[in-house]
């Protein structure tokens, strides 16, 4: 078996340093999506550290390009913050608590819950509606790993799309569906 030698410059393309993290929320304002509307659906701050080289939608703004089917992000959540209930139908989403405590809710109405403490992890099965929320008093960090080929499969209930439209306008709801991985189609056949 022959190995390859990429040298320091080649390896530098694969190293993601903390100074190179960029929140992806602000990237959508030019596409008609106010930061506040994006944050209504997601964690307060999301840093995509690694995404497939062909990434689109919500994974197009990344610190480094990686293998197909793998995205790694950090969700930084102030107290009480986290995404709304959503589902992934084709990708596994794995949460690993780095700092703080997170309530994990699942079920179509978030009727089930458990708590992730520091270094706890959960692999949420395909098709299960889920959300997490920082239940601590300080900003908390959650490592988010997404595995699977179609990473544009983030679904929210239609009622969530209606909430976005009521608060920010139908054009913002439509821009979210057009320019991110998020759709308001959970519960649709």
Regions found by a protein language model. Give the residues of each.
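Double-stranded beta-helix
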Residues: 2-8, 131-189
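Conserved short histidine dyad/triad with adjacent acidic residue
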Residues: 51-60, 73-88
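Residue-level recognition of conserved beta-strand positions in structured domain cores
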Residues: 74, 87, 106-108, 134, ...
């Amino acid at each position: 078996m022959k190995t390859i030698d990429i040298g320091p410059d080649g390896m530098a393309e694969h190293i993601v340093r903390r100074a190179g993290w960029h929140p992806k929320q602000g990237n959508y304002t030019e596409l008609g999506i106010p930061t506040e509307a994006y944050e209504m659906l997601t964690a307060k701050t999301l840093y995509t550290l690694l995404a497939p080289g062909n990434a689109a939608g919500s994974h197009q703004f990344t610190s480094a390009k990686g293998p197909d089917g793998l995205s790694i992000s950090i969700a930084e959540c102030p107290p009480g913050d986290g995404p709304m209930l959503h589902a992934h139908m084709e990708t596994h989403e794995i949460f690993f608590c780095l700092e703080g405590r997170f309530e994990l809710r699942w079920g179509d109405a978030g009727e089930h819950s458990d708590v992730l403490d520091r270094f706890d992890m959960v692999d949420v099965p395909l098709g299960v509606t889920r959300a997490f929320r920082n239940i601590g008093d300080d900003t908390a960090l959650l490592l988010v790993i997404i595995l699977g080929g179609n990473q544009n499969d983030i679904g929210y209930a239609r009622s969530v799309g209606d909430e976005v439209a009521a608060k920010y306008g139908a054009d913002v709801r439509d821009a979210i569906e057009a320019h991110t991985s998020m759709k308001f189609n959970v519960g649709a056949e």
